[in-house]
Amino acid sequence: MAHEKRILLPQDLRPIHTLDAYKATGGTRGIDRARSMKPRDVIEELKKAGLRGRGGAGFPTAIKWTTAFEDPSPTKYVVCNGSEGEPGTYKDRYLLQKNPYQLVEGAAIAAYVVNAKNVFIGLKAKFKREIANVQRAIDEMVKDNIIAKDYIQIVPGPDEYLFGEEKALLEVVDGRGAMPRIMPPFLQGARYTPTEYNPTIVNNVESLSHVSHILAKGADWFRATGSQDTPGTMIFTLCGDVKRPGMYELPLGTTLRELLFDCGGGPAGNHPVKAVFSGVANRVMTEEIFDTPLGFGTMRTAGGGLGSAGFIVYDQSMCMVKVALMFSSFLAYSSCGQCIPCNRGC
């Protein structure tokens, strides 16, 4: 399947490891345009584009940014969630390996819109290569006067599933362990105090990477592909019992069957596909819903879930009891145990 790559580099393009190389592809045009606009107009551009968060919930980005923008609090922050702990998902790390500049640019645009005091990028401390790439991008943009020194900071975090939960991520940003807070980021943000709640935008790597391109090329360009429910493209990680595991950037609205068979080449062995999971907490997906268009609303309506678009495939040779044991063991180990269903096993 041949589709336009928007944030995932084409196979014939080398990784972008310098700011000059990024600019040669049109990089930094997004932030230049954003800064020539009023902050509310930038939000309107994202609203027109229909960008939804690519981290799992699919929440409209424009609504999230509007909440922070309209809040009268004098101190606000932007946080990028780059922890990526969902089994079967690798796309954010891949983006940071190949082109960290689009993330830094997107984060800087978000910071401009809400007049953020600082930007924090949360990455697992073990992501050594990705941390080095992002820091290099930050340093080059500082040298080029695109962002101020120390304005965007990397926050290394633990190798824990909970680090990817946005309220737990904020705890790590504040120097504590990865245990989720009760209040959401717009009511209890980074560096909060009893008198200052510091509303905070939290977006993941893929979401912020899209922002830089939307501002550079416009909402109509973004909506030219994808579906009404979920415009644009999304990166799908495909692994397990398929011939061609990997990462595929596809228009939303592409069917699950096309992802599995046209991109992934179908089952790797002689057994048909038995089950597909889009994350360990989502329900099992079987043949009956393979023709469902990939999108947040369409997958939910079909009884499945899009999640962060990491798909694990099992063929008929796999024992589903074994899979259930693996998934439940992972969730039991990873749970924070703060709410009743996980604490009591209800």
Where are these regions (language model features)?
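Ferredoxin-type iron-sulfur electron-transfer modules in oxidoreductases and energy-metabolism complexes
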Residues: 29-45, 74-76, 82, 91-96, ...
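N-terminal glycine-rich phosphate/pyrophosphate-binding loops that anchor nucleotide-derived ligands
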Residues: 34-76
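Histidine-anchored nucleotide/phosphate-binding helix
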Residues: 99-113
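Iron-sulfur (Fe-S) cluster-binding modules
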Residues: 1-49, 112, 116-121, 232, ...
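Hydrophobic alpha-helical positions that pack around
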Residues: 131-252, 264
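Gly-rich Lys/Arg/Thr-decorated short loops/hinges at beta-loop-alpha junctions or inter-strand turns
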Residues: 22-28, 80-92, 191-194, 237-242
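Local cysteine-cluster metal-coordination motifs and their immediate loop/turn environment
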Residues: 48-62, 161-163, 274-283, 304, ...
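Short loop-to-beta-strand transition segments
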Residues: 64, 119, 264-280
